[in-house]
Structures are given as structure tokens and as C-alpha cells.
Amino acid sequence: MEINEIVRNIFGSDVPLESPVTKPKKESSKHSRISINLNSVNQYIETTLGENAPIENVQDNRVGRLGPNVVKFDISTHQGLFIISPNRLSINSQSNFSTMKANVAVYKGKWMYELQLGSKGLMQIGWSTAKCEFNQQLGVGDTVNSYAYDGNRVRKWNVATHKYGEPWLPGDIIACAIDMDNGTIDFCRNGRNLGRAFENITTGAGFAYFPTVSLALTENLTANFGSTPMRYPIEGYEPLQAAPKQQIDQATLLFNWFLRITEVINARQNVNDENTLRDGNMSVQAYLMCLTRTVVKHIGPLVTVPYIAEYILVPFIQQLSESKTDPPLLLTCLDLFWTFLEEHEMKVCLESTVMYLLSAFRHVSLLLEYPDQCKSLHLLTKICQHSSTRQYLLQHLLFDRVRFANFMHVKPLDEGGLADVVKDVWWEMSPTDSTIEVNKASYLNACEKIKTAISEVETLQVELLVILLNNSDGNEKKPTSRAIFLRKLKRFVQENLDTSRTLPITLCCFHRLLVAFRVLWDAEVGTSPVYIPCRAFYDASIDHSRTERLGGVLSHLNKTFRNELQQLLGPEHEVITAMDQAQDSSNVHNRTRLMDLPIVNPTFSRVTGTDASGQGNSMIFERVGYFPYTREDRSPLRLGPLNPTTSLLELLDSIILFYHIVAKKQLAKVAILRNSMSEYITAMQDTKAKLEKAKKKKDPMFQSIQQELLRTINVFNTKLTEQARHMAWIRAAVYSKEKQSQIAWLLKVVALTLKNASLEENMFSFVPDFYLDALADLCVGLRNHMHPTASIEQVPNYREMFLDIAEFLCEHFMDPRIVNANSKSSLLLTLAGFVFNPLTLEILENVPEESRIKVVTNLLKSYDNRAWAESNWILVRFWQGNGFVFRYEKSPHLSKKVGPKLLQQESISQPIKPCPSAVYQNHVRDVLLKNPQATTKLLNSLLNQLNWAFSEFIGMSIRDDCYSGS
């Protein structure tokens, strides 16, 4: 292949090149001829780009605009506290009501800017003049010459307020457009004009308007004043920041050349002939690399410009990702970028790309097919197939900058979208209403349609996670993507202990992680049933250093059961070695030297990828309960491929903790919506019954009553229609059979983990406390939150599953190995939950008799060193409804109590329908009769508690009488 042929295929015929037929001078060589041609190419590129070079330091002098070229929020104008991004385009309010203006004003012409909402709460966005003064009560729209729209309250503001627009949602793009020539202001939501908001605004001499936003506490948004292309440009309106036209022209040329080079390089990767240039002594591949460097050195500075990154780079990457070549063009492109771009250029390039994809993904979809979300996931997945890029994104972006959990979410459609999909609404009623029941088939079909659309997005999300969990891209010098992901996920889960993230996002993330785990487990391990062996809780293979254990504090357990640990692990195991070193260090009163002490076990050094005197010690000390410096895991990542079983079990462990910390809350939240809907249904049925009675009355006074009742029924119908559409989404996305089966599968895993750990005698004490909490959470989720919408009978072998759990609860109630106070309470409340539910009480009655008698015996023990109220409550439940004083669901004197309603949660304080158990009544009788000494002790404890309770009650009554008398 000739040099001229290569160059002209890439750059065209205008490049002046030395002809190969020209006889070179004596001092010329083949090498110098290649250099001359490369210089010619470089000069051609610079000359061509110079024709479109932007003029330096030119002021944006468009008529009607005042201010600097680069538009951003002006921190000198802020009122209240904000968190603001480095580029001063994203803000988060930290005061009750905070206001900030941009640094550019307009006085003539038509102008616009866009805001992407990060939340949906109280925000006023619009325009104001320089003379408008704001405080923590007054924001934009609350003063004379300021104008605003608030989609939270669906109103427009200019001192007075009027209904305007439509409700907004997180991810919405709100455009704010001002026409200074005609004195009008308009707002658009996701490209749809909301109508004329204001007319005849004050214009003329001395009046220039600044983009202005006012946000309530924790509300947040990101502005686009023109630094990137407008998502929904409005014809005739200009962005406040001008597009970099010359740089766009340069980038267009460069990326066209780069595409041709990439295609040639890619095509030659599978070609073995003509490796050397015909007219030189350089390989074709090396010459192509020289050309690539010549082009990419000009691309580098351009991709750091946000507008170029979004307008040119992202579509370019999208184009490459759609090619069907082998190897993929995109991977070749990324290889070249990593080779020739500067580090900071590559960082900005990837960050701009991922931030754009996240912005597009978070945008509220107008179509059920989620085209923008699928497109973003497709492209991110393709990018992550490149090893170096994937590892960089995991280390620096997906957890630290953009939160990968946002890519795991599937947002509901807005009200209009749901109404288009769920045209006919239905809800369960008893007795059934024919006018509602006729819509059932259509409603359930709509639910299936939603579920099908969601499942396509979920499949892409799981595919992305599987790629991020790649375990084959490490070597002796670098960790795998899985190692990075697990470390970052652990920190992400721990952060949720202290912060409150959006609940729907966390639940979606939980389900995707669980499905990805099962896909990887089946592919790499394949054993069944799945559970976490107890050894993982005491051999430091999984980091539980920041976690309470069932048996108490980890360092105490290590000391108490040292001999057993040594027998199980061996005297040279890293856990034993670390304990010895910690003991030696404490003897010289110098805890800070723990990091300097060597781990003598060479096996562990190989696992962690450090030498015996390396920095891996911190990890082991922390994992066995010693914290030499801080609680942050600063140990080096393990190098090379991880053990598939151990690494996936670590992932599963994090998933279980993640569910316990946050994911369970969303299930409870949607259950509240379902219960609220049930209350509306009951209220409407009662109102209809009253209407029928009123119709039978002939008194004219009842005519007005009928009108009022009809109005009330219409209000209920409107609310129920809205809730029924939301429930359609919940049925498809949260309470689907697939999601229910995932929760049930995880419950079996947790139950089997606890059951097998219990067989290891004292080692059971090392089980992290959140496993017992997760057992309770998963039981409640299946039994109370998902059921009856997702009937528990759908779960295969659900009775056997709950029977195993019930037996575990009976056997481990008051287990001496469980020392942690919270764990004791959690186990007791889980047992109580089984007692008050008819389904699980029946299962509890079918556990082996030995286990039933054991739990009753423990319940009847005296109240030394344990909570007595919960035990009494369980005992009382065995009789409630089976005796003259226990026949009420709610005490009569409380049945008409007026006051705020409590959230419906599983709690012993909630009124519950009686559900007596003759089986356990008989066990209580038998245990009391067979153990007279223990019975006497129990009765003494009961009488003491009654004496104390009555004394307190009488004392309070006397004090009340004294206060009322005075």
C-alpha cells in the first residue's frame, strides 16, 4: 500500500505530497520521505483548521445581551445557601428558600435557557431585573419585576399568583423563553409549550432581565444557558450563550478524518499481507498511527469544550457503536483515544459523554417504549465493553460523579402518559361494582403492556451490570472490574446508612443487582441452593468490619473463640496472624504501628496482590475488628482475577445489606398508597349508600344533600382514577410476579444462610446482625407489602419456605449465642409478625412439636434481662378472640378516638383482627402444669409488673387531679 493512497483516502486529494516516481536526492532516504509526507499532512491539517479558527477573546456582542461570553450562575447574587457545581450550572438549595441569578441579562430580542430538574419540589424559575431584591421568604415571581413558573404548585407568579402549566417531575426539561420586543414570557415542558405565561412585561430603558431561580430546601436543578445544545430549541429564540461555530466546523473536519483513519486501522487488524509501505521502510500500521496522532492532537482540546462533546463527540460515538464490524469500530476508537489523548482530555471526554447519557436517561419519557433510556443504556454498555474505559468509569465516574444507581432506575410515565396507556381504570371492590368490573380486562392488559416495556429496559440494565462485573480484565499489575465494582458498591451501600436516597431508585437498583448476581452465579459457579457459608463471616474473606454481629462486637468474639477459630482456620491464617500482631502492638502501647506489622502468611499476600510487608495489613486488621487508623477501607485492591465464588458471595452480601437499609422502604411506601386507595374505595361505597338513602327521602332538604353527595362521589372518582393508574404502574414495576419471585428467592437464601450458620455452634455468633433484620424485612415485604396485590400463593412452595423460617424462629428465640440487643428484638418482632398473621400462624402451628414447646417455654420464662411487653403481647395473641375479654379487634374506648392516623406498619401497637391459636393455648397449659417452679416465678413476675403498672397509673391520676384542682 502506498503513502499517497492512504493519505488521499483519508484527507482527500488536496494534500500536497511528494510523488513516488520522483527520483530522490542522494541524501534522501525512504525514512525522510515518510517524514516529509507526514509534515505535509500536518501542515495541511493546520492550514485547513486555520481557515475556521475562532478569533481569540471576542466579546459576544449580539444585540440585546449584556454580560460575559460564558453564562453561568452568579454566586455574588445568591440569597440563602447553595451547593454549586464547579462549572456553576448545577445548584442545590441548602436554605428554606434560596435564590440565584445568572451573570447575563437581556434587554432586547428573543432569548431562552433550559433547566433540567433534579427534584420535583417547590421551585420558582423565570426572569428578574437587577433591582429585584430577594430573601428567604421572597423569590423570583414574588416581586414586581420578576416572573416565575412553579410546576410543583402548578402556578405562575408575578406578585399575584394564577393557575398555569402542568405538574413537573424530576428529569423534566423546562425552557424559559422571553420576548423583549413584544414583552412576553413563555415556558415549555419537555418541548411542549405550556401557553403564554405573561404579557406586557415592563421593558424599555433601565430594564434588563436575568435568568433567576428560587429553590426550597434540598431542591436541585441543572441549567443550560447554551454551553451545550438546547434539548428543545424554540424557533426564533437564541440561547444566552452563543454556540462555538468555528470550533464546531473544526471538530466536524477532524472527526471525519478520524473516522476514516479508524476504519482503515480496523480493517487492517485482520490483514497480514503488505505490512510494509511500498515506498518506505515503515509498517502500514505504524504509519496509520502517526496519522492518528497528527489528527488526535487537534481533537484533544476540542473535546474538552462541553458543546463539542455533546454536539459532535456523542453522536460520533453513537455512530461507531452501531457499526457491525469485527472488531467493533468503537473499541478501536477508544484504544486510539487512550493512546493519543492527554489524561485530562480523556477524563473530560468520558465525563461529558456519561453526563450527557445520564441527562438523557433521567429525562421523563413521553413514550412507553422508553426510546431515550434504551438508547443511553445501549451506548453506555458499548462503551463499557472497552476494558480501560470500563475500569476508569468505575474508579472515577459511575459511583463518584454520576451514581450508577441512576442508570438502574425506570421512571414512571407522567400523568398524561399513564392516561394514554391505562385508558380504563379498575380497582377491587367487595361487593363488586359492575361499572368498574367491566374495565378489569382492559386494565390488566394495560398492566401487562407496561410490564413488557419495562422488562426491555431492565434487560439492558442487567446487561450493563454484568459487563461492569467483568472478572477477566485484571492481571498481576491491575485489579479486575469486578474488584473495583465490589469495593465501590460496598461504600455506596454504607453511604445509604447515613443518607436518604430516592427510594424508587434504590429498589430498582436492588432488583437489577440481584438479577445480575443470579446470571453470573449460574454462568460461573452453578451450584444450588445458594447461601453464604458461615466461614465467610469469620475468615475475613468478606469485609464486615463495620457491622455488628449476632454475638456482639467482633474483636470480643475473636478473643472469646480464638481457639475455635485457630482450629477451623489454621494457626497461619491471616485472621489469627492479625490478632497476634494486634496483641503484640497493644503490649507496647502503640496502636499506630499496626499498619507497619507484616502479615506473615504468603498465601494471603498473593491473594491481595501485595508482598508480605505491603499495605494489605489494614484490610485484615479492620476485618477482624481492629481499626488502626480510620474506618475507611484504604487497603489496595486485589490484583488479577478474583475467585468467582467468593467475589459473587461478596456481591450477594452487599445486596442483602442494601435491601435491609433502603430498598425495603419503597415496598412499604407503595403499600401505603394501596391502603390509601382502599380507604377511598370504602369511603366512596359509604357515600353511595348514603346517596341511595337520601334518594328515598322526599323532603326537599335532601335534594341539596344529594347534590353534595354526588359532588363528593365525583371527587372520590377523580382521586381513585389517578390512584388506579399509579397502581397499574406499581403492579407492573414493583408488585409483578417476577419481582415477587426475586424477593422470595432472596428470602430463601437468607433463611438457608442463617440455618446453616446455626449448625456451626459458636461460629453462629459471627453472623452479621443485618441478616436477621433482612429475614424479617423480606418476610414482611412478601407477606404484608406485596400480598394481596401479588398473592403469596404465587410463590412456589411458599408454605415450606415459611415453615423453615418459623422453625428457625422457634429454635432461636432466646438463643444464648444471640447477644446483640437489636438482634434479640428483631427476632422477637419477627416471631410476633408470624403470630398475628393467620397464614403464618397456621404455619407456626405446623412446626415440629418440640420447637413449639421450646418457644412457649421461653416465652413463659420470667422477665429477667429481656423485654416483657412483646412476650406478653405474643401470649395474649394466642387467646385474643377466644375469650370474653379478648373478643375486640380494637378496645371499645379507643374505637372512636379522633386524631392523626398512624402509618400502617407491622407493629404490635397496631389494631389487628383477632386470630387465636388453640394449639399454642394447649402448649401454654401443658408447660405451666409441668413446671410448677417456673410457673410460680412467672406469676410473681406478672404480679410485680401489674403492681408497678397500677402504681404508675394511680400516681399519674393523682397528679392529674392535683393539676386540675389547682
PLM region descriptions:
Residues E235-Q241, F537-E548, M677-K690, A806-E807, ...:
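Eukaryote-specific, cytoplasm-facing alpha-helical/coiled-coil scaffolding segments in long proteins
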Residues S119, A243-N762, P768, L772, ...:
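Long amphipathic alpha-helical scaffold regions
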Residues M1-Y370, C374, L379:
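PRY/SPRY (B30.2) beta-sandwich protein-interaction domains
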Residues L253-Y311, L875-G965:
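Extended alpha-helical scaffolding regions
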Residues K669-M677, R731-E738, M786-F802, P816-N822, ...:
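HEAT/armadillo-like alpha-solenoid scaffolds in large eukaryotic assembly and transport factors
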Residues T292, I317, F337, L380, ...:
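Hydrophobic core/packing positions within alpha-helical solenoid repeats
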Residues E322, M346, V519, A523, ...:
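Flexible helix-coil junctions and inter-repeat linker/turn elements that act as hinges
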Residues C508, F766-V780, Y798-E800, I818-A832, ...:
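Alpha-helical solenoid repeats of the armadillo/HEAT superfamily
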